[in-house]
Curated annotation (Swiss-Prot):
It comes from Chlamydia trachomatis serovar D (strain ATCC VR-885 / DSM 19411 / UW-3/Cx). Keywords: RNA-binding, Transcription, Transcription antitermination, Transcription regulation. GO terms for cellular component: cytosol. This is Transcription antitermination protein NusB. Belongs to the NusB family.
Length: 168
C-alpha cells in the first residue's frame, strides 16, 4: 500500500466544512460596502455575493443577515464612533474604513454575553481587513478608535442579532 493510499484511509471525513469567520467578515464588509453605494440593491446582493465571492447561497444569505443587523444598529454604532474619533469625523473616513469600524464594533458588542471574541482577535481581523480592502496608512486611526472603545464596557444594542451571532 502506498503512503498516499494509507493517508487517505486515515484522513477524517467531514460532512461539510464550517464557513470560516474570516470569510464571513469579508462577505459582510463587501455587502455593507455595496449597500452604502446602492441602498436599494439588497434584492440582488445575495446573487452578487455568490458570483463575485464564489460562495453558496446559504453563506451569502448568512452574511446578508449580519449586514442587516449592523445596518439596523448603525445609528448607535455611528454615535459611539463619532464620540470616540477625535482627529476627524466618521463621514471623512472611506466607506471601507467606516464599515470595518461598524462591523468590528457590532461584533464586539453583539457577542459580549454569549461568547465574547477576544479583543486581540478583533484587532488582528481589523488589521487584516484594512490590508486586504483599504490602505495601511488608515489603520492607525481605525485601530486607535477601536482600542479606545474596547477599553470600556460595551453599551447594549437596540437591535441585537437573533437568533444566532457570529459565534458560530
Amino acid at each position: 500500500m502506498s503512503v498516499m493510499a494509507s493517508d487517505k484511509a486515515c484522513a477524517p471525513v467531514r460532512a461539510s466544512r464550517p464557513f470560516p469567520k474570516q470569510k464571513l467578515r469579508e462577505l459582510v464588509l463587501q455587502a455593507l460596502y455595496a449597500l452604502e453605494i446602492d441602498p436599494e440593491g439588497e434584492d440582488s446582493l445575495v446573487s452578487l455575493l455568490m458570483t463575485e465571492a464564489s460562495v453558496s447561497k446559504k453563506n451569502a444569505a448568512y452574511a446578508l443577515m449580519f449586514c442587516r443587523a449592523i445596518r439596523a444598529n448603525q445609528p448607535d454604532l455611528d454615535a459611539l464612533l463619532d464620540a470616540t474619533i477625535r482627529t476627524t469625523t466618521l463621514a471623512r473616513l472611506t466607506i471601507i474604513e467606516r464599515n470595518i469600524l461598524r462591523m468590528m464594533l457590532f461584533e464586539h458588542q453583539q457577542n459580549q454575553d454569549c461568547c465574547p471574541v477576544p479583543v486581540a482577535v478583533l484587532i488582528a481581523e481589523t488589521t487584516r481587513l484594512i490590508k486586504k480592502f483599504s490602505y495601511s496608512e488608515g489603520s492607525s486611526l481605525i485601530l486607535a478608535v477601536l482600542g479606545s472603545i474596547f477599553d470600556h464596557p460595551a453599551p447594549a444594542l437596540d437591535a441585537p442579532l437573533e437568533p444566532t451571532s457570529m459565534c458560530g
